[in-house]
């Protein structure tokens, strides 16, 4: 396997970068990542799901996007683990731009006049009630801010842990980075969304706790799947990147 950066150089010298590999699956993963990201954000605006029970006095309820959004962190783990932080950084920015673009398109649809028949059986009020969040400033800013901070936190933590663990204990890296990334993401998203009255402050603790615990739980349960996908990709792509000497500045796109 072509390890782009060898974690244990035989001669003790500084790790060096190998030749750029031909990536066969990378583009597909980008497409799936962006799809999951956009759908989960639309679902977050559309509905709040109630589990129907309480835990330690906290009602178990979360926005519907929470059902799918943890998968984006699994993709983030896979991207950083296999392809390294530098490629993941470009994917995170790609997702950010696509998410902003989808919000812009929904906003344009919202302000365009509705046809008479559509107004009768659906109407502007129904559109705004379900998709208004994705086309209004509050949910858009909350989504973009939470996503950006959370995904970069997740990727940086995983990349640095991979070096510290010398590539061992993948489960520790994926769960550990998710604990940090999801906490930052969830807190920022709920705070900003509540400031813009997307969610009532009365649900703040419930949404933060249930969203965070659910997302981390999904990551833990999906660890065997993550292992299988990571091992398969490393074998197919013939790459296993270690971020020695990487500039972790999110604004450096090279």
Region annotations inferred by a language model:
Residues 17-32:
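N-terminal membrane topogenic signal
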Residues 34-50:
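Alpha-helical transmembrane segments of multi-pass membrane proteins
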Residues 67-78:
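Central hydrophobic cores of alpha-helical transmembrane segments in multi-pass inner-membrane proteins
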Residues 95-96, 144, 148, 171-183, ...:
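Transmembrane helix-bundle signature of multi-pass membrane transporters/permeases
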Residues 99-119, 147-151:
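Transmembrane alpha-helix/helix-exit interface in multi-pass inner-membrane proteins
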Residues 109-138:
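Membrane-interface interhelical connector segments
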Residues 161-174:
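Membrane interface segments of multi-pass transport proteins and intramembrane proteases
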Residues 229-254:
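Short, highly charged, low-complexity non-transmembrane loops/tails of multi-pass membrane proteins
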């Amino acid at each position: 396997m072509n390890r782009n950066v060898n974690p244990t150089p035989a001669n003790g010298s500084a790790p060096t970068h190998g030749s750029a590999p031909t990536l066969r699956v990378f583009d597909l993963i980008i497409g799936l990542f962006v799809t999951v990201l956009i759908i989960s954000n639309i679902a977050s605006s559309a509905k709040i799901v109630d589990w129907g029970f309480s835990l330690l006095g906290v009602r178990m309820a979360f926005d519907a996007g929470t059902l799918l959004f943890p998968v984006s962190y699994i993709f983030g783990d896979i991207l950083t683990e296999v392809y390294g932080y530098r490629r993941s950084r470009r994917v995170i920015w790609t997702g950010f731009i696509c998410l902003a673009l989808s919000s812009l398109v929904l906003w344009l649809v919202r302000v365009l006049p509705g046809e008479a028949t559509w107004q009768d059986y659906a109407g502007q009020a129904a559109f705004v009630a379900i998709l208004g969040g994705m086309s209004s400033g509050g949910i858009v800013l909350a989504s973009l801010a939470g996503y950006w901070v959370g995904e970069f936190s997740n990727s940086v933590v995983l990349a640095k842990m991979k070096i510290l663990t010398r590539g061992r204990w993948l489960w520790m890296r994926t769960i550990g980075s998710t604990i940090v990334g999801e906490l930052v993401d969830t807190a920022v998203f709920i705070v900003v969304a509540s400031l813009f009255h997307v969610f009532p402050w009365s649900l703040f603790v419930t949404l933060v706790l249930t969203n965070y615990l659910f997302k981390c739980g999904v990551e833990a349960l999906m660890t065997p799947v993550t292992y299988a996908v990571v091992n398969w990709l490393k074998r197919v792509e013939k790459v296993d990147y270690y971020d020695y000497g990487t500039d972790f500045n999110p604004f450096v796109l090279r």
